[in-house]
């Protein structure tokens, strides 16, 4: 009977360890060195000390520089918040970059999103295709469906590409 209990306990530990490996996600990650793409996903909190790189982060991402392929949640880093593919997030940093599609809000000195919808607030806001509002000193979009509020507002695909103060794209 005792031998059987040891086997059951060993099997339970093996199941927990293999389940952890199968899901490959951590509730808390302290990223103290650069990780390569294809690394552990984080579902919870990631601390970037100084830089973290994970495929997917769901939850809170804080530190100095945060880099991931997919971000869902809040990304608040001192120097940079960088997403390679898709972000459904609030990004707050000196520099925010979403190389794919942003759905959410970017607040920074410099915001960059290849495409997306939501709100960009910063000194410099750049986007290729954006649906929403850009508020900043300089706002530029190739295609914009929404508003730009700032000193220099440029919508490259518009009939009148430059309008100061308020620019509207339809």
Residue ranges and their predicted role:
Residues 11-19:
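Hydrophobic h-region of N-terminal signal peptides that target proteins for export
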